[in-house]
Each structure stands twice: as structure tokens, then as C-alpha cells.
Amino acid sequence: MTDFVSTWNKDSFLTYPVGPLGLIAMPGTEEMGVKVNSWLKKWQDHTEESMPGDMSTTPGAERQDFLIDVTCPRFGNGEGKGMIKESIRGYDMYILCDPGAYNVEYKMFGQTIPMSPDEHFANLKRIIAAMGGKAKR
């Protein structure tokens, strides 16, 4: 990931986006999400400079940040839910998830517990369900 972000090739991606892009960085992938977001912003700036035409009519052109704020809170009995804190209607969404991130912890019954791969996957399913549950494009 680091090599790809640092070796920016200005001629590689000269395309208009089909729809506004959204990026969700699940717990444990926040650092990588920031890197992908900075690369996408660089791509957006380069596209605006190099492509002919008016980019202001392109869907999502006014966004300054591609990261979408989400949370997966837990209830007292251990159950969880996925919450997306802004509208993503019409967006092309990408989700970064690392099921092996044992450094992510949550509190249950007053104890701090590391997240298992199954819990990461359950949070991923919760966010997909909160998005509408299926791909539209």
C-alpha cells in the first residue's frame, strides 16, 4: 500500500468517476483508510486539473473527504449494531476491513476484550446491512 501511494503516476487514472465515492475504514484499518483517502484526494485534484470539461457537475465533486463516519456500538448484552452517520445514497462504497486486527478492543460486562475475526466479520455485515444490504451498481 505504501509503495503504491508514494509512487503516484499522473498518467494512470484519467477517468471521471461514475458516482460519488465513499470509503469506510472499519476498526483496525483507520491508518490505511487515511492513506487511501489521501491518495483518492490526490487523484481527484489531478483529474480536475487535467481533464477537459467542468468537474463541478460530476457527482461527489464537492466532497473534500472520501471517508464516511461509521460506528458499531455494542449493547449491554454484547449484541451490536452498525450505524452510518451520514447519507450515502447513490455513493459507490468501498469498505476496508482487517479481520485479523486483534489490537481492536471493546468493553463487555466491564471487561476489555480483543475483537476476534468473527466479530470483525459481524461488524462488516452490520455496516453492509446499514447501507441497504446489496450492491446497486
Predicted feature residues:
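PRPP-associated nucleotide enzymes
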Residues: 1-137
